[in-house]
Regions:
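Surface-exposed, low-complexity/disordered Ser/Thr/Gly/Pro/Asn-rich loops and linkers
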Residues: 1-51
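His/Asp/Glu-rich, glycine-adjacent segments
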Residues: 4-6, 71, 86
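Beta-strand signatures of extracellular beta-sandwich domains
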Residues: 77-79
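A short, hydrophobic C-terminal helix/tail in secreted or cell-surface proteins
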Residues: 169-187
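Extended, low-complexity, turn-rich repeat/linker tracts enriched in Gly/Pro/Ser/Thr and Asp/Glu
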Residues: 63-73
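Short, charged juxtamembrane terminal tails flanking transmembrane helices
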Residues: 189-192
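Terminal, low-complexity interaction segments
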Residues: 50, 63, 81-164
Length: 192
């Protein structure tokens, strides 16, 4: 499916690069309407650090660029999972703090300024995981085809960071070995 530049004025289903007319500042979004069915946009990241990662922190801004003319709240739901390919992922919902819910829900259909009235900044949080070196993490936002008109929802300013498993300093190993040696010495001394 192609990505179409739009301001939120169209109710045609599909992927959109939403933004104000003539602006280079854009957000990746969708209108899951008509024949599109559910729309997913995904990001694949491979852990090439050489170490296990114990968590990831994700933040983004949710933006609504179109009011579909319905009073129902529509959402982008964030899910994640691990797998070599998109088709092989067992998806896990990250939690409510990661989801974006539409903010303009009225019977008047039309465009919404996603950088102002339609914006919810700072969504996301931290997810504990066991992300092995070499594994691929998939993150996706899901926009379902709701009954009636669909709102135009988008993501912008996506940021991710990761936490590696703690690796003991060499001095920690030296102290551990010295401590074990002292315990062994004391045990031998008591026997004598």
């Amino acid at each position: 499916m192609a990505v179409t530049a739009g301001t939120g004025s169209s109710n045609s289903g599909g992927f959109y690069s939403f933004g104000s007319a003539g602006s280079a500042e854009r957000a990746l979004g969708s209108v899951a309407s008509g024949s599109t069915g559910t729309i997913n946009y995904a990001l694949a990241l491979t852990n090439n650090t050489g170490a296990a990662l114990t968590s990831f922190t994700l933040s983004y801004d949710g933006e609504q660029w179109r009011n579909g003319g319905v009073t129902a709240t529509h959402s982008l739901t964030l899910q994640y999972g691990f797998g070599a390919s998109y088709a092989g992922v067992a998806w896990t919902t990250a939690g409510a703090g990661f989801d974006f819910a539409s903010v303009m829900n009225s019977t008047t259909a039309g465009l919404v300024d996603g950088n102002a009235a339609g914006k919810v900044a700072g969504l996301g949080g931290t997810v504990a995981t066991n992300w092995a070196a070499g594994d691929t993490l998939w993150v996706r936002w899901t926009d379902i085809d709701n009954t009636g008109g669909d709102h135009g929802l988008a993501i912008d300013n996506v940021s991710m960071s990761f936490t590696a498993a703690a690796v003991p300093e060499p001095s920690t190993y030296a102290m551990l070995l010295a401590g074990l040696g002292a315990v062994g010495f004391l045990a031998r001394r008591r026997r004598a």
